[in-house]
Amino acid sequence: RKWFRSKDKKVRLIGIDGNKNSLEYAKKHKDFEIEYIQEDILSSDFQIPKCDALISSHFIYHFSDQELIQFLKSAKDKINTAIVFSELQRSKISYTLFKFFGFLMPFSKKVKQDGLLAIRRSFTRRELENILKEAGINEYYFRWKWWFRFILIIPISSHDA
């Protein structure tokens, strides 16, 4: 928000989560002026708010292929500039390494289980490319990050509405 203010631009940041505890934690530990909304994004009633950019971190593994296709189709009509996903990449190596380091690290049982589930349910690049194609998205960029993560950037301005 500081960067936007330094450029004399108005910005409204909205955090959406279905988990009340996550939202309470975020509100207590926030450094930015963010409006938080409790909604179930996976619900068929959920409406993506019109905005300039949609940024999602470590979430799309909750969607089935078809749900993600529908979400992307809907998002293209609501987002002005870009959709950005920061996600895990599913692989045998990442799963095995998480199991190993999870054993060594003092993670709670829940964190270990959630981490393994997230890796098992995350997408491969090929799967995401097929999903993007089905959603009518032809322009996108993958940026690979350490520890089996990637950033997927989908510019919206180049898509036909």
What do these predicted regions represent?
Residues 34, 52, 81:
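Conserved acidic residues
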Residues 1-44:
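Class I SAM-dependent methyltransferase SAM/SAH-binding core
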Residues 55-56:
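A conserved beta-strand element that flanks and buttresses the S-adenosyl-L-methionine
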Residues 75:
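Class I S-adenosylmethionine-dependent transferase superfamily signal
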Residues 88-134:
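C-terminal alpha-helical "lid/dimerization" subdomain adjacent to the S-adenosyl-L-methionine
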Residues 121, 125-156:
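Conserved Class I S-adenosyl-L-methionine
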Residues 79-90:
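Conserved beta-strand signature within the Rossmann-like core of class I S-adenosyl-L-methionine
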Residues 59:
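Hydrophobic adenine-recognition pocket in adenosine-nucleotide-binding enzymes
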